[in-house]
Regions:
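Beta-strand-turn-beta hairpins that frame and shape the catalytic cleft
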Residues: 1-4, 114-125, 169, 229-236
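Active-site neighborhood of phospho(di)ester-bond hydrolases with catalytic His/Asp-centered motifs
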Residues: 5-8, 40-45, 70-78, 109-111, ...
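Core catalytic region of metal-dependent phosphoesterases/phosphodiesterases
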Residues: 6, 12-118, 192-203
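Active-site environment of divalent metal-dependent phosphoester hydrolases
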Residues: 10-16, 47-52, 77-85, 116, ...
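Cap/insert and terminal regions of metallo-dependent hydrolase folds
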Residues: 48, 60-61, 68, 168-217
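Active-site regions of enzymes building and remodeling cell-envelope glycoconjugates
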Residues: 69-71, 89-94, 105-110, 123, ...
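Binuclear metal-dependent phosphoesterase catalytic core
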Residues: 117, 204-209, 220-253
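Active-site-proximal loop/helix segment associated with metal-binding centers of metalloenzymes
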Residues: 119-197
């Protein structure tokens, strides 16, 4: 069985749904490979539960329900769930619990700082990022302070990493700071790009403490891959492309 990865979804606000429909995925990977997909992981900014967006969520859920596999989401920065404290936690047999937001299709968020065992792969799950446009957003309506990790989360993470340093893959929203600078030249008209992102700096510190085969992330609205000779691993950024992980083979289309 395999795992599908995709980048920012934004509740389909930029027509991202067309990138992950059943038809698109079969055209990309062929029916035999599509039938092997066990989970779909969105690498942050899934954008579900946006205030006033209930009809859009229902539309997206209906489209995603045409596919037979559950959706698991990394925490991004444009995520209403960051401001919620009453989301049910459920155990689906992949290690840490997940935060379930929908039944059919099954949609849930992975916990930041969690270790998950999915299809025999060991994942460290991170999340969050700087909202470069937060000056134009409203606190707790379109921007949430918890896009940054709080001190307790960081302390718990580093305690975890004292015991666990070896992973198969890392999943985050933004990448490590130095890799972001190498790979991305993302610019938005009218918005000053702020390169100092506490989450990206945190990711870089984590990157220096662990070993893994590859790092997957989104956030930058680009599809790029960078291999770091010093760390001896790759960093895959996704947006319009998707990645399929089967055993340890990765197909990006």
């Amino acid at each position: 069985m395999s795992i599908l990865f995709s980048g920012d979804f934004h509740a389909n606000s930029r027509d991202e749904l067309k990138l992950i429909t059943k038809k698109t995925l079969i055209n990309k990977y062929q029916k035999a490979e599509y039938d092997e997909i066990k989970y779909h992981i969105i690498l942050g900014d899934a954008g579900f539960l946006w205030p006033g967006n209930e009809k859009t969520d229902l539309f997206n859920y209906k489209a995603l329900a045409n596919r037979p596999f559950p959706v698991l989401c990394v925490m991004g920065n444009h995520e209403p769930i960051l401001g919620m404290s009453d989301v049910p936690e459920v155990n689906i047999g992949i290690g840490e619990k997940v935060l379930q937001i929908n039944d059919n299709p099954f949609v849930a968020y992975l916990k930041r700082g969690g270790i998950y065992k999915i299809e025999n792969h060991r994942f460290l799950v991170l999340g969050g990022a700087l909202s470069i446009d937060k000056e134009f957003r409203r606190p707790n309506i379109s921007w949430w302070k918890r896009e940054y990790w709080d001190e307790a989360e960081k302390v718990n993470l580093f305690l975890l990493l004292q015991k666990h340093k070896k992973f198969d893959y890392v999943l985050s929203h933004t990448g490590p700071n130095r890799i972001n600078r190498i790979v991305n030249t993302y610019k938005t008209p009218g918005i000053t790009l702020k390169f100092f992102d506490e989450v990206a700096v945190l990711n870089e510190e984590i990157d220096e403490r662990i070993t893994c085969k590859q790092w997957f992330c989104g956030h930058w609205h680009t599809d790029k891959y960078y291999y770091d000779e010093n760390q001896r691993r790759g960093y895959q950024y996704l947006y319009e492309k998707t990645a399929l992980l089967k055993n340890d083979e990765i197909i990006v289309l």
